[in-house]
């Protein structure tokens, strides 16, 4: 992905304006409790910490570097690229993993297909399906607007 984007970039200026922003995305979360015998219980609602993703957006001229504190699944990455007002956007996973426990950032379709909980990170994910896409769209648009794109 990075190589495909880099190959398309033409440097036409000696200096480029730089802007950046950091934001946090919060959605309802879930807790997974293991019981004796191997059974697992999912807890949601009051008393459960929200699921959080730390977002970093940096604009270098007409290039955007957009970082996430977890690993963004492809469908979400494609949607972010569609929303970008810049032609060249590079998505960076795990850029602040120690600051937020985002883990794998699943899209709802992938989550729904994994009924057997075999995807890496699915069982332990604190993400509650149904919230990330809309919040990611909102934050992405707001962040690009704030940095002047």
Please place each PLM-identified region on the residue numbering.
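Non-catalytic substrate/cofactor recognition surfaces at enzyme active-site rims
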Residues: 1-149
């Amino acid at each position: 992905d990075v190589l495909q984007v880099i190959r398309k970039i033409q440097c036409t200026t000696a200096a480029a304006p730089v802007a950046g922003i950091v934001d946090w995305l919060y959605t309802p979360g879930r807790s997974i409790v293991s019981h004796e015998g191997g059974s697992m219980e999912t807890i949601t609602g009051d008393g459960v910490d929200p699921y959080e993703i730390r977002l970093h957006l940096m604009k270098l001229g007409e290039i955007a570097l957009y970082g996430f504190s977890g690993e963004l699944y492809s469908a979400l990455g494609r949607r972010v690229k569609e929303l970008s007002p810049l032609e060249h956007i590079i998505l960076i996973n795990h850029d602040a993993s120690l600051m937020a426990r985002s883990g794998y950032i699943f899209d709802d379709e992938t989550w729904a297909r994994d009924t057997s909980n075999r995807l890496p990170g699915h069982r332990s994910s604190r993400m509650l399906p149904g919230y990330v896409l809309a919040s990611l769209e909102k934050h992405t648009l707001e962040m690009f607007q704030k940095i002047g794109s």
